[in-house]
Regions:
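Cell wall/extracellular polymer interaction/catalysis modules
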Residues: 1-138, 146-164
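A conserved hydrophobic position in a structured secondary element of the catalytic/binding core
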Residues: 143
């Protein structure tokens, strides 16, 4: 199955169309760290990370990982070893915290953009995550909790996302 994002407001999964939002500066083939753009292309999905203190384990065929207080995603363009990877927040490297006070990362699926042949500065922390108000993101794709939970029931470890 392929998740399709044809425009910045609609995510298609099987026969479902979900309202969504993307990066503040739209969708682009040319992506750099901090440009607020959602990367264009075909990508695999990582496992589901979720806040078990706020949600029960969702039904999905994806591998599920509980988010803890020490989880982050490295966005340090000078850290070749950890850039665009899951890191322990106790490491002395710049990162996006996954354990947040707000709800946005209660459910996240990292999109495997800039994973293989990782290039420093080409963008990191590109996730599917939650939103309530559909305000543009820093480059991620966000949808409502209700829609995210429906999507989780439909996708599997072989699902890809096509962004164009």
């Amino acid at each position: 199955m392929t998740i399709i994002l044809k425009n910045k407001h609609s995510l298609e999964v099987d026969d479902f169309k979900f309202k969504c939002c993307v990066g503040k500066n739209g969708i682009s083939k040319e992506k750099i760290e901090g440009d607020n753009k959602t990367p264009k292309g075909n990508f695999k999905l990582e496992k589901l990370y979720y806040r078990s203190d706020r949600l029960n384990k969702p039904f999905t065929k994806l591998k599920c990982v509980k988010i803890n207080k020490n989880m982050g995603w490295c966005n340090n363009i000078k850290d070749n070893a950890n850039y665009n990877k899951l890191v322990n927040t106790k490491k002395k490297t710049k990162h996006e915290k996954l354990y947040r006070k707000d709800f946005k990362y209660d459910l996240i699926i990292p999109i495997k953009y800039n994973w293989q042949g990782r290039k420093l500065g080409k963008g990191s922390c590109i996730f599917l995550h939650l939103t309530k108000n559909y305000k543009p993101t820093a480059g991620c794709i966000a949808l409502s909790k209700k829609d995210f939970l429906i999507m989780l029931k439909l996708i599997s470890t072989r699902t890809k996302i096509k962004i164009f």
